[in-house]
């Protein structure tokens, strides 16, 4: 995740349902999202449940999602939750907390329905850590007939003990809107999209943006890059933004070498109108094969390009960590009772360092500009609590006083990565650096194998 804090000058410039008979029991989770019949800015979601052998079932909406490091309680945006048997009879449902519901007679459960409110139109727009807003790139937008930002963790829930069950997602949408995602649409209809995922965690890592068609695609080696843009006034188009982004991503791919194996990568760019009911949190959120980005539409093209270069490159480098190299806490992420990892210095710090290092390495910026950036990080880190253990802060980042120090992962975290890079280069006579270390860790673990938090430093020393 990369958050953008606008300068004071720029900030001043910006000013400021019907239920019928459902299908029979099944062994997957079949979700339908209706983007056609939007009522009062709410979307209906219907879920055909898998088979339960227990008397009760627990249905959950995430409290937190990977990459955000904050409790966002997406259940706050869900209402009118109902459960039904195969004949359409209501089953008793009890709200356990803001994110979870207990369903009685679960052996009869066939269907769950609920309404979803979006997050963009209620954001307060406070500074970093000053409000309870969902970070916009991790949020949701419902603008009937114009735009739907489907960060699926805000629309689709999961049943406890069924997290590993395959998901099928059907999205009914206006024919005037196109859904862009790294997922492949299995339905040829221009009014319905069908996607499948092996489990819940895989599904919610695949955001979709629906808007009037405005996208480009290009190949970088064997990887397809798709850029989709929503600009409410039409100020910017994907065609305008693509050349700059293509140059940057070719440089990233060259810097990474053989690291990235994904065949398709989607960049979903939402440009906010900055009206009171639009997104106010600027930056991006990473996923294994995509990035969601939110920026103010009022930005000039040159500034927008520079911001995109920094934030999108940061998110893309998350392919290295934590999407490839990560701990058990990341591998087995619990959306409602998360256990955080000690190693934000790596997940965010190394990533931020790479996002700057590749630019000088590939000739996108001069050496002096790179040194100036790192000097700024030294200055910014000096205003934080330098005596606080970075691993302890990471492990406890969801609560104070550690939470308020999170932003330091982009400052001190990047500096830790740079120091480690220098140390490795000195000891190897310049033959290795931190990129090689991450490659070695990837070979040791990879995306399917997690490390134990308390063993990482020993493994780094060994390598």
What are these regions (language model features)?
Residues 50-86:
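N-terminal, post-signal-peptide region of Sec/Tat-exported proteins
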Residues 71-80, 85-250, 254-262, 281-283:
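Non-catalytic architectural context of zinc metalloproteases
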Residues 216-343:
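Juxtacatalytic substrate-recognition/specificity segment
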Residues 398-399, 403-410, 414-463:
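Amphipathic alpha-helical substructures
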């Amino acid at each position: 995740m990369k958050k953008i804090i606008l300068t004071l000058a720029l900030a001043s410039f910006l000013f400021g349902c019907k239920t019928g008979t459902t299908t029979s029991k099944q062994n997957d989770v079949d979700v339908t999202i209706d983007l056609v019949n939007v009522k009062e800015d709410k979307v209906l979601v219907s879920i055909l449940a898998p088979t339960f052998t227990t008397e009760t079932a627990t249905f959950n909406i995430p409290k937190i999602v990977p990459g955000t490091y904050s409790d966002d309680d997406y259940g706050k945006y869900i209402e009118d939750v109902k459960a039904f048997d195969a004949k359409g009879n209501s089953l008793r449902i009890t709200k356990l907390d803001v994110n979870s519901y207990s369903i009685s007679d679960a052996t009869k459960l066939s269907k769950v329905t609920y309404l979803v409110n979006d997050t963009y139109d209620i954001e307060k727009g406070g500074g970093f850590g000053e409000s309870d807003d969902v970070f916009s790139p991790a949020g949701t937008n419902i603008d009937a007939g114009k735009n739907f930002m489907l960060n699926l963790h805000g629309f689709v829930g999961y049943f406890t003990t069924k997290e590993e069950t395959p998901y099928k997602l059907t999205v009914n949408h206006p024919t005037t809107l196109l859904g862009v995602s790294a997922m492949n649409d299995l339905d040829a209809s221009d009014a319905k999209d069908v996607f499948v995922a092996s489990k819940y965690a895989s599904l919610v890592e695949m955001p979709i943006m629906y808007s009037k068609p405005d996208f480009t695609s290009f190949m970088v080696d064997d990887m397809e890059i798709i850029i989709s843009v929503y600009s409410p006034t039409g100020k910017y188009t994907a065609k305008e933004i693509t050349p700059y982004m293509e140059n940057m991503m070719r440089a990233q791919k060259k810097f990474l070498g053989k690291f990235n194996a994904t065949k398709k990568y989607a960049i979903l760019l939402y440009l906010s109108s900055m009206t009171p009911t639009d997104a106010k949190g600027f930056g991006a959120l990473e996923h294994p094969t995509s990035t969601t980005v939110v920026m103010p539409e009022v930005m000039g093209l040159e500034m927008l390009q520079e911001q995109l270069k920094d934030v999108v490159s940061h998110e893309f480098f998350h392919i290295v960590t934590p999407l490839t190299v990560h701990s058990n806490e990341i591998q087995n992420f619990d959306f409602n009772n998360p256990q955080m990892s000690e190693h934000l210095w790596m997940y965010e710090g190394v990533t931020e360092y790479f996002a700057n290092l590749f630019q000088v390495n590939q000739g996108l910026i001069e050496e002096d500009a790179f040194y100036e950036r790192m000097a700024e990080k030294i200055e910014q880190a000096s205003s934080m609590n330098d005596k606080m253990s970075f691993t302890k802060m990471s492990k406890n980042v969801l609560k104070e006083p550690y939470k308020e120090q999170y932003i330091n992962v982009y400052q001190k975290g990047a500096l830790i990565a740079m120091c480690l890079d220098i140390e490795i280069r000195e000891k190897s006579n310049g033959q290795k650096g931190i990129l090689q270390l991450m490659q070695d860790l990837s070979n040791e673990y990879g995306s399917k194998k997690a490390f134990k938090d308390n063993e990482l430093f020993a493994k780094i020393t060994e390598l």
